[in-house]
A protein has these predicted regions:
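Conserved amphipathic alpha-helical segments that form helical-bundle/coiled-coil interaction surfaces
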Residues: 8-11, 15-18, 22-88, 101-109, ...
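Short linear motifs at protein or domain termini
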Residues: 1-22, 64, 130, 134-166
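Bacterial carbohydrate/catabolite-sensing allosteric modules
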Residues: 26, 46, 94, 113-116, ...
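A short, acidic/glycine-rich surface segment
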Residues: 90-92
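Anionic, Ser/Thr-rich low-complexity intrinsically disordered regions
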Residues: 96-100, 118, 128-129, 133, ...
Length: 166
């Protein structure tokens, strides 16, 4: 189920960003910084294919930076499963710009050695991608009925920590 994949992926991406905060190398930091710079450039030019590739590379660099082979393997599997739809959502100018901004915020949290903030931002980044996929009508690409708005909202109010659940 796509919803489950995004829910699990959001948590694992958060964990990955958390771990990367203390384990990332200088070279990986430079890769992320360059990635964001290039993403902004290609977004201004309307190059959606390049931005989709840069988005993939951003996540791959983050997976490497956490230095956990098992976590990287799990995230790559989830990432690959939703790749087709991700390319379509990233071709949307608004989502592409939002995604780049979210990457930049994750990068800044890692750079500033703020593991909890990096975790929260990475988690929210995946949730935002999921919400955009549903709003764009791409959920059906997996042969599934789209959830109702209340089914996919990430409830962080009052300490809630799940998709549509408290």
């Amino acid at each position: 189920d796509v919803k489950d994949i995004y829910m699990i992926r959001s948590k694992l991406e958060g964990l990955c960003a958390f771990l990367a905060t203390t384990q990332i190398t200088d070279e990986q930091m430079e890769e992320l910084e360059e990635n964001i710079y290039l993403s902004k450039f290609h977004a201004k030019k309307g190059h959606s294919e390049q931005n989709a590739e840069l988005d993939n590379r951003f996540h791959e660099t983050l997976y490497d930076a956490c230095h956990s082979k098992m976590l990287k393997h799990q995230l790559q599997d989830f990432h690959d499963y939703v790749l087709r739809v991700r390319k379509k959502t990233l071709s949307q100018t608004q989502r592409s710009a939002e995604s780049i901004k979210e990457h930049e915020m994750i990068f800044e949290a890692i750079k500033n050695k703020q593991p909890q903030e990096a975790e929260k931002l990475a988690n929210q980044h995946i949730i935002n991608a999921y919400k955009n996929m549903v709003r764009s009508g791409l959920y059906e690409a997996y042969g599934q009925e789209p959830p109702k708005e209340e089914d996919f909202l990430y409830n962080t109010e009052n300490g809630g920590d799940s998709y549509g659940q408290d």
